[in-house]
């Protein structure tokens, strides 16, 4: 009499499905670097931004990536105009 042999082979490792999570981008570190009323030296970065969220005022330059920087040594002053925010640099804060 012949015996039928029933052999089942199981996986030694469980098949694991991939996940769609697990990635994240580095923070861009945008925003104000110098606050209102603080003293800044020439060339200091005042505000990092995407687009002109804040516009340049007196003695403030704009970089190619819309970064605002000081042109002179002085005090930072943020102001609100009708439809836009603006930042300026003054040598003496009492003149404002």
UniProtKB/Swiss-Prot annotation:
GO terms for molecular function: structural constituent of ribosome. Coiled coil: none annotated. One of its GO terms (biological process) is translation. Residues 1-10 form a propeptide. Signal peptide: none annotated. It holds the Pfam family Ribosomal_L27. PROSITE patterns: RIBOSOMAL_L27. The N-terminus is cleaved by ribosomal processing cysteine protease Prp. The keyword Translocase does not apply. One of its GO terms (cellular component) is cytosolic large ribosomal subunit. Keywords: Ribonucleoprotein, Ribosomal protein. The keyword Transport does not apply. Disulfide bonds: none annotated. Belongs to the bacterial ribosomal protein bL27 family. HAMAP family: Ribosomal_bL27. This is Large ribosomal subunit protein bL27. It comes from Phytoplasma mali (strain AT).
